[in-house]
Swiss-Prot record:
It comes from Gallus gallus (Chicken). A zinc finger (C2H2-type) spans 247-270. The gene is DPF3. InterPro entries: DPF1-3_N, Znf_C2H2_sf, Znf_C2H2_type, Znf_FYVE_PHD, Znf_PHD, Znf_PHD-finger, Znf_RING/FYVE/PHD. GO terms for cellular component: nBAF complex. This is Zinc finger protein DPF3. Its main location: nucleus.
Length: 427
């Protein structure tokens, strides 16, 4: 049976007890702060939007107990719906009747001037709008082009109907002040309408049939609730794809399973975009059909592919590399006829020498040198010395994961030996 501790301070120690109470208080504070940030949220069990509550009191809210056995009492906070005041019927808010060209007639009482009228109205409006009162709608017979318009006093002031529009700068200041106060009051009114909308929603699960209008905030919550499952599945698929293809292009975000594939993608896709716009535009004007010719390789009478006489990246020929400004021999694909400078292709010295000894293929036409097929290109390994491609499952013994660092095929290891790029990295 558990032992009752009558005096926890004596059993645990004064300092330990104070620290425990302080930790408990800080934990509760953090928990309440975190919950208040997430409010309002849609309860998945009841479908009700949970708002902040007032059950959390502080020490300064304590009062003496009122009933027997009460140690403390806290002030009650009753729910109160925001009241909307009806437009007050105040005679001071009504515009005086303006009768132009009658103040100078003999026998008539002279009315106040327009400047005095606007100044007086601005003072009255500021006084009443500061108390959150709303102006009343009055019928104001303002003559404008022979028509009578009915509007509120504020709208009449803002539109300037029945009043001459030619005023000095000092006379325009009160109207600008009225407009500023009106805009602030309208913004506050919109916020109050949204709060009342949340309070007026019936908290019932059984609703009548039909398609009642769903509030905007609830549509957002329902959309988030519905989309959580699909988003989780999409995130799982994306994480699996990230695991399968760890090499990411930092320019376009395309992923590859091995580093050689990423290198070829960068060389053939983004290297040309780093060139100057002027050089590309100039070459486009001089040879506008070059880009179209790349997609359809030209064949000679004997059926042999005719290679392009310009680099696919810098658009220079064999007589000049526009990137380095020096002449350089072109390397052409045996399948599509595309050409490129070895430096533009980021070839090493071993690659530049090796591609002259066999029918080289570009990255779009690359196939396995053992089986001769180009399928499963994500399984292709490219030699860092001769640029040949090999399926990982076609190698002997098969390779299940792309090796880290440089990799050389069996031909280059036998031919180059210690000059091979992967010398010392492969067993």
């Amino acid at each position: 049976m558990a032992t009752v501790i009558h005096n926890p301070l004596k059993a645990l120690g004064d300092q330990f007890y104070k620290e425990a109470i302080e930790h408990c208080r800080s934990y509760n504070s953090r928990l309440c702060a975190e919950r208040s940030v997430r409010l309002p949220f849609l309860d998945s069990q009841t479908g009700v939007a949970q708002n902040n509550c007032y059950i959390w009191m502080e020490k300064r809210h304590r009062g003496p107990g009122l009933a027997p056995g009460q140690l403390y009492t806290y002030p009650a906070r009753c729910w109160r719906k925001k009241r909307r005041l009806h437009p007050p019927e105040d005679s001071r808010l009504k515009l005086l009747e303006i009768k132009p060209e009658t103040s100078h007639l003999p026998g008539k009482t002279e009315l106040i001037t327009e400047t005095e009228f606007i100044t007086k109205m601005s003072v009255d409006l500021r006084r009443f709008l500061s108390c959150k009162l709303y102006t009343s709608e009055v019928d104001l017979p303002l003559k404008k082009d022979g028509f009578t318009s009915e509007s509120t006093t504020l709208e009449a002031l803002l539109r300037g109907e029945g009043i001459e529009k030619k005023m000095d700068t000092k006379e325009e200041d009160p109207i600008q002040e009225i407009q500023r106060v009106l805009e602030n009051d309208e913004n506050a009114d919109e916020v109050n309408e949204e709060e009342d909308l949340e309070e007026d929603i019936p908290k019932r699960k059984n609703r009548p049939r039909g398609r009642p209008k769903t509030p905007t905030w609830k549509k957002i919550f329902q959309k988030n609730a519905r989309g959580s499952g699909g988003g989780r599945r999409r995130n799982d698929a994306a994480s699996q794809d990230d695991h399968d293809k760890p090499y990411v292009c930092d320019i376009c975000g395309k992923r590859y399973k091995n580093r050689p594939g990423l290198s070829y993608h960068y060389a053939h896709t983004h290297l040309a975009s780093e060139e100057g716009d002027e050089a590309r535009e100039q070459e486009t004007r001089s040879s506008p059909v070059h880009r179209n010719e790349n997609h359809k390789p030209q064949k000679g009478p004997d059926g042999v592919i005719i290679p392009n006489n310009y680099c696919d990246f810098c658009l220079g020929g064999s007589n000049m590399n526009k990137k380095s400004g020096r002449p350089e021999e072109l390397v052409s694909c045996s399948d599509c006829g595309r050409s490129g400078h070895p430096t533009c292709l980021q070839f090493t010295t071993n690659m530049t020498e090796a591609v002259k000894t066999y029918q080289w293929q570009c990255i779009e036409c690359k196939s396995c040198s053992l089986c001769g097929t180009s399928e499963n290109d994500d399984q292709l390994l490219f030699c860092d010395d001769c640029d040949r491609g090999y399926h990982m499952y076609c190698l002997n013994p098969p390779v299940f994961e792309p090796p880290e660092g440089s990799w050389s095929c069996h031909l280059c290891r036998e031919l180059l030996r210690e000059r091979a790029s992967a010398f010392g990295f492969q067993a």
